[in-house]
Amino acid sequence: MGADAIQVHPTPPGFWGSPKLDEDRISTFKEAAAKYGHPPFYFHAVYLINLAGDDPTMRSRSESTLTGYLKSADELGVNGVIFHTGSHKGAGFEERLPSILEHLRKVLERADPKTARLLIENNAGLGGSVGARFEEIARMLDGLGDPRVGVCFDTCHAFASGYDERTPADVARTIDELDKVVGLKNVDVIHCNDSVTGLGSNRDRHANIGTGEIGENGFRSLLHEPRLAALPFILEVPGAGNGPDAEQVAVLRRLASS
């Protein structure tokens, strides 16, 4: 495929469960990582997680699942676990923030990661999803005050939430805002996805690079933004129907070099 950064779903993303590891799997993974020079490697947690809702059973299960993910990531030497905080389902961010922080503290306490980070992904903003605005992510980071927690910045979700990325000036403004509110020092990885729907649509629909509303000019601008140069870019696009592929990686490389 020609990629040099990796994200995987170690368990089916639409079902509850955490990775199950044994010594053989751990050893095999670490040998392969060493063979290929330890590329940036991330887990994406299951999509069912909701730490922001009012159902205590759902929150408890979400906490347990995320804890298992973070433990496994740390055992393997994976860079981090990317996750969606969930939806407050109309209760409001301020109402649910204390509960979110409580559960995330417990995840960190129980997993006790030495190197793997817990990475909050920004959301598209549909249905009370938490983290669509940079200010909400900043509140969670500040409330935790833990260097083991960082951010995954998703280009499609940001665009759907109203952060424009279509021109060099748009990208500069959005990254200025991200740095001012969240702090680029907290951003660990970028999900690089075009958007099927328009600016501020609050809809999470990924498109192949250059075929959506952000467009090639937007991604060229993102790839040439010097403040993002050291970060891995992870594709989460449909490709030819089976997800990210060599063609989409080649598109990014072409835009980065043009």
Residue ranges of model-derived segments:
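Hydrophobic faces of well-ordered beta-strands that scaffold small-molecule active sites
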Residues: 4-8, 41-45, 81-83, 118-120, ...
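Active-site beta-loop-alpha junctions enriched in small/polar residues
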Residues: 11-13, 46-48, 86-88, 121-125, ...
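Acidic-and-aromatic substrate-binding clefts and catalytic sites of carbohydrate-active enzymes
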Residues: 12-25, 49-52, 88-91, 126-131, ...
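Charged helix-capping and loop-helix junction motifs
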Residues: 21-27, 63-66, 97-101, 133-137, ...
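Alpha-helix-loop-beta-strand connector modules within alpha/beta enzyme cores
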Residues: 23-43, 100-113, 138-144, 213-226
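Active-site acidic/histidine proton-transfer and metal-coordination neighborhood
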Residues: 51-150
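Histidine-acidic metal/acid-base catalytic patches
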Residues: 134, 138-258
